[in-house]
């Protein structure tokens, strides 16, 4: 039996029980069962097409058709997109061009989903009078300024019409569409619950795959590239202290850690949507997946996200006390176990595994600051060709900019970096105001806001340890959009409460007392 069929069997053996769990926990409680079943069928269909189609373009056609089918019948486009976001790796190839145009754009699963689902939703939203037009919020203009600046500065290196159009289309797909739809799609609280639950369950499904790849030293999805006739450069089987660094469907171990850290930070937002038992068991699985990712930057980001979420809003002291006791218990248990030294070796700051990475990052910062100083305002489009950067070239023949802030400053200068950081600050300020508004209206909304705020802070830390590529830009823009939408929902809810003159709270989903599927 070929590797791809063996991998598919193992993936289905882990994923089918997870899909059944989704139906038991979320069906009709958070997500309408008919919509959930449709999304799960599309999920399985896309996975099977990736492994069995034997041709990339046939896989694209089948996947696109399944996405369009689900989208045409579902009322929550962002939830559909998030449900199908991590089905397969972002295996990439070029859409061929014609004449003097060598290719149109690069295409992969992420861009296909953005084009089919979010593109459809964007066109539909533009015709709806109830949807706020683009430009209604300050965050809209900051997002537009950052995306437009990248296009304008790209003119310095390749001022051809074809290249500018290609760059604009790719930024529209990767940045504008996820941000716009995420910031407008949830017109009410049930729709927001649907989006959060869909996103977090999609991330949760990566956890058993990550643990399996770590434990068995077998990357399950690398055979997809060969099955589709592609030679995508995924740098397979990178080892850390004798263990393979998992990829799951993220395409990169650092990106996988980032995704799982986002899930860990955001998971408290769905606390009220499931039983206590199911929430704790699924959260433990998610944390286990994060630990197995071997991404130390993600460890730090997830920890900060949890602390910020716990330390914000009403009852912060109680939450932090419980968190401290739980953390102390875990530390004692690990210290007394025979794996204490091995666990400590993987930890950031105190671990002794791959210490050369720390040295490389320090040198990268020093060299990058010298290069930035030459073009401080708008950076340089050819910074990789600078002689100073050559000393950072690694054995693989690449210069890895493992710090997104440095990468932005090198390419767009302090102007671009300032706009980029401002996007986060404005999004977090809006989330903070939403938390304060919801404190007297809805404990559920307050919890969602705390999770959003903590996760955004964690993201800002993690991107200082990784390049921003593959699914990372999509997730960041989605988080910015969700933060804006959350703020607007709390504003609308507060205004409705004041208008009614009633001190009632927004009703929350009832917690089931009977044991559910775990």
Language-model segments: what does each one mean?
Residues 144-155, 196-312, 433:
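Alpha-helical transmembrane segments of multi-pass inner-membrane proteins
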Residues 16-19, 67, 452-512, 516-518:
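Transmembrane alpha-helices of multi-pass inner-membrane enzymes
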Residues 340-412, 431-440:
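Long extracytoplasmic/lumenal interhelical loops at the membrane interface
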Residues 271, 278, 303, 307, ...:
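Hydrophobic transmembrane alpha-helices and their immediate junctions
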Residues 5, 208, 213-220, 237, ...:
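A membrane-periplasm/extracellular boundary helix in multi-pass inner-membrane enzymes
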Residues 70-176:
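N-terminal hydrophobic segments of proteins, predominantly signal-anchor/transmembrane helices
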Residues 248, 252-254, 287-291, 295, ...:
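A conserved mid-to-late transmembrane alpha helix and its immediate loop/hinge
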Residues 15-16, 20, 29, 34-44, ...:
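Hydrophobic alpha-helical segments of polytopic membrane proteins
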